[in-house]
Amino acid sequence: MTKTIYVLNGPNLNLLGTREPDIYGHHTLADVEALCRETAARFGLEAVCHQTNREGEIVDLIHEAAKKQAAGLIINGGGYSHTSVAIHDAIVGVQIPTVEVHVSNVYARERFRHQSFIAKAAFATLCGFGIEGYRLAILGLAARIGLAAKT
């Protein structure tokens, strides 16, 4: 049975490629999802990708990942990263190895972006690498759960 990882993208990430391209670049959400599926497959993993603008739906998807025994979770909570205790608590509650990803370097931006509730629940955070951060997150997650790339 193939192990799965959940890749969750929060609010406004559906606008990748058109929203503030000087900050977020020109790659689209479809590009992110294709990159995640391709990278995960190198480790024998299936990437289950979701995007939602709703906080409660992110919490539900985290619970779903646990129920379906996902091997890991990669999450870009968008603006909810800086505000959502509920998402933090969901990650802590399910105890799935989690990597937080941000396309931009949140620490080089507005001060309110410097705090992340998700980071406090994740074993790692990547930011500022553009969509390449998702690939790096999968590499780190695979190492964390003991998987090597298939040749």
From Swiss-Prot:
<feature type="site" description="Transition state stabilizer">
    <location>
        <position position="19"/>
    </location>
</feature>
<dbReference type="InterPro" id="IPR018509">
    <property type="entry name" value="DHquinase_II_CS"/>
</dbReference>
<keyword id="KW-0028">Amino-acid biosynthesis</keyword>
<feature type="binding site">
    <location>
        <begin position="103"/>
        <end position="104"/>
    </location>
    <ligand>
        <name>substrate</name>
    </ligand>
</feature>
<feature type="active site" description="Proton acceptor">
    <location>
        <position position="24"/>
    </location>
</feature>
<comment type="similarity">
    <text>Belongs to the type-II 3-dehydroquinase family.</text>
</comment>
<keyword id="KW-0456">Lyase</keyword>
<dbReference type="Pfam" id="PF01220">
    <property type="entry name" value="DHquinase_II"/>
</dbReference>
<feature type="binding site">
    <location>
        <position position="76"/>
    </location>
    <ligand>
        <name>substrate</name>
    </ligand>
</feature>
<dbReference type="InterPro" id="IPR001874">
    <property type="entry name" value="DHquinase_II"/>
</dbReference>
<comment type="pathway">
    <text>Metabolic intermediate biosynthesis; chorismate biosynthesis; chorismate from D-erythrose 4-phosphate and phosphoenolpyruvate: step 3/7.</text>
</comment>
<dbReference type="GO" id="GO:0008652">
    <property type="term" value="P:amino acid biosynthetic process"/>
</dbReference>
<dbReference type="GO" id="GO:0009423">
    <property type="term" value="P:chorismate biosynthetic process"/>
</dbReference>
<comment type="function">
    <text>Catalyzes a trans-dehydration via an enolate intermediate.</text>
</comment>
<dbReference type="GO" id="GO:0009073">
    <property type="term" value="P:aromatic amino acid family biosynthetic process"/>
</dbReference>
<feature type="binding site">
    <location>
        <position position="89"/>
    </location>
    <ligand>
        <name>substrate</name>
    </ligand>
</feature>
<feature type="binding site">
    <location>
        <position position="113"/>
    </location>
    <ligand>
        <name>substrate</name>
    </ligand>
</feature>
<protein>
    <recommendedName>
        <fullName>3-dehydroquinate dehydratase</fullName>
        <ecNumber>4.2.1.10</ecNumber>
    </recommendedName>
</protein>
<comment type="subunit">
    <text>Homododecamer.</text>
</comment>
<keyword id="KW-0057">Aromatic amino acid biosynthesis</keyword>
<feature type="binding site">
    <location>
        <position position="82"/>
    </location>
    <ligand>
        <name>substrate</name>
    </ligand>
</feature>
<feature type="active site" description="Proton donor">
    <location>
        <position position="102"/>
    </location>
</feature>
<dbReference type="GO" id="GO:0003855">
    <property type="term" value="F:3-dehydroquinate dehydratase activity"/>
</dbReference>
<dbReference type="GO" id="GO:0019631">
    <property type="term" value="P:quinate catabolic process"/>
</dbReference>
<dbReference type="InterPro" id="IPR036441">
    <property type="entry name" value="DHquinase_II_sf"/>
</dbReference>
